[in-house]
């Protein structure tokens, strides 16, 4: 009985190590995702506001720099992620712009960054579906 307990503990430790030791991964970008709104033709302003709502709800600071472009910044402790969000009435893209303390090497980045961008993408899709 004791050996089964130790085997279970050892297996749990190995799983935690495997999950916790993920190395850098390729940067996740979203390219030309369709604007899937419930109404036929949302305006550029409506698309921008939906993107802004999605980002703010997830803790991103979303700043419109010009019509069709936003700069998204997420600050979590010492980590900073900055993305360009380009959008039109038909599609949007989320692209890596800059980061701090995420180990970006020109191609790869800390895996948490990818999760944050994937969550932003999901949030944008959800907000756009409400238009």
Segments predicted by a language model, with ranges:
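Bacterial N-terminal signal peptides that target proteins for export
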Residues: 1-9
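Hydrophobic helical h-region of N-terminal Sec-dependent signal peptides
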Residues: 9-15
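C-terminal motif of bacterial Sec signal peptides marking the signal peptidase cleavage site
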Residues: 17-20
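Ser/Thr-rich, low-complexity intrinsically disordered terminal regions
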Residues: 22-131
């Amino acid at each position: 009985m004791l050996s089964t307990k130790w085997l279970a503990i050892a297996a749990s430790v190995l799983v935690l190590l495997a999950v916790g030791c993920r190395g850098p991964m390729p940067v996740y970008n979203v390219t030309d995702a369709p604007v899937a709104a419930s109404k036929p033709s949302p305006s550029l302003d409506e698309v921008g506001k939906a993107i802004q709502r999605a980002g703010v709800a997830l803790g991103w600071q979303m700043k419109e720099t010009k019509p069709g472009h936003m700069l998204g910044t997420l600050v979590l402790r010492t980590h900073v992620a900055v993305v360009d969000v380009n959008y039109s009435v038909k599609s949007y893209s989320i692209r890596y712009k800059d980061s701090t303390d995420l180990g970006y090497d020109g191609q790869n980045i800390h895996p948490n960054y990818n999760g944050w961008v994937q969550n932003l993408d999901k949030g944008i899709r959800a907000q756009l579906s409400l238009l």
